[in-house]
């Protein structure tokens, strides 16, 4: 089918698609690329039909430019006047039209992802952006203006702040904790183990006496009286709480785990002959003995305590 002449269309709609009209305008230019305004001008000058209802067909033409791979967008150089980018034909779409006729198109041109021109296109765009950045920097240097500081850009660097959260580790460590008796936590002498030595018990006793005067009497914390830990199952922790180990026996290889127990009331100092008396009176202290039941049910009066010292000792042992 021969191509119709230019003067045969007059006011009728030409039989060309928007892709054909755009390709015709680009190939007819000297530089083989045109801005969008020049493409509009070429079509309206060549075909009078498109001089009316310009907004409708121009929207359709822009849609074809953006969604067809046969057209590529070229940014305008800084030295070129005007605004907007240029549009050109893809180098590999030369045979898109059969026999050079814009009336018959072979098939829709599609650029594959593995196209070898894609890396060069990306590199050209990067080079163009670098050139624009250099031009802007030179313009700023010539005008004497300064660039904004780097902190304004979102580079992940936050300025240092002097504000510290009240629950920060520095604030927690810096706090001065007070004990119930008014003794500061920092003045307490920590013990190296759950079982203190003989020379350490006096220091612990002094701290306990100042921390809990209502729980321990002065006679129990007498530093002159030696305290033997050989036959005792109880110990004193660093905070003055009596503890008892879970593991018993001298042959235990595992370290003893201190278990806090409930502190008892203040007791007077016991004489040295009490263990002998308690060992002799062990049958009377049996839970099944009627004497024990009688002593627990009827407390001794102050007169009985003064006249019968063994009753007082028995009540202390039962307690």
Curated annotation (Swiss-Prot):
Domain of life: Eukaryota
Claim: S-adenosyl-L-methionine is one of the keywords in the record: no
Induction: By FGF signaling.
Localization in the cell: Nucleus
DNA-binding region: 13-107
Region (Disordered): 278-310
PANTHER family: FORKHEAD BOX PROTEIN, FORKHEAD BOX PROTEIN B1
Protein name in UniProt: Forkhead box protein B1
């Amino acid at each position: 089918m021969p191509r119709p002449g230019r003067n045969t269309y007059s006011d009728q709609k030409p039989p060309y698609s928007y892709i054909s009209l755009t390709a015709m305008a680009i190939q007819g230019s000297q530089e083989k690329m045109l801005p969008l305004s020049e493409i509009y001008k070429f079509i309206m000058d060549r075909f009078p039909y498109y001089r009316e209802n310009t907004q409708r067909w121009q929207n359709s033409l822009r849609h074809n430019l953006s969604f067809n791979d046969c057209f590529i967008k070229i940014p305008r150089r800084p030295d070129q006047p005007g605004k907007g980018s240029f549009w050109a034909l893809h180098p590999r779409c030369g045979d898109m039209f059969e026999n050079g006729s814009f009336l018959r198109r072979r098939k829709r041109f599609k650029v594959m992802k593995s196209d070898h021109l894609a890396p060069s296109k990306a590199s050209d765009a990067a080079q163009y952006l670098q050139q624009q950045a250099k031009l802007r920097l030179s313009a700023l240097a010539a005008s004497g203006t300064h660039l904004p500081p780097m902190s304004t850009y979102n580079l992940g660097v936050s300025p240092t702040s002097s504000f510290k959260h009240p629950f920060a580790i520095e604030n927690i460590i810096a706090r001065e904790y007070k004990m119930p008796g008014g003794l500061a936590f920092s003045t307490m002498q920590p013990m190296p183990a759950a079982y203190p030595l003989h020379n350490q018990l006096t220091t612990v006793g002094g701290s306990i006496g100042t921390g809990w005067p209502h729980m321990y009497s002065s006679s129990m914390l007498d530093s002159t009286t030696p305290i033997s830990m050989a036959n005792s199952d109880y110990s004193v922790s660093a905070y003055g709480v009596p503890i008892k180990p879970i593991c018993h026996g001298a042959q235990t290889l595992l370290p003893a785990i201190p278990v806090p127990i409930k502190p008892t009331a203040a007791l007077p100092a016991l004489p040295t002959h009490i263990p002998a008396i308690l060992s002799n009176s062990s049958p009377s202290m049996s839970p099944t003995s009627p004497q024990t039941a009688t002593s627990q049910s009827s407390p001794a009066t102050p007169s009985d305590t003064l006249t019968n010292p063994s009753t007082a000792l028995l009540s202390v042992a039962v307690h």
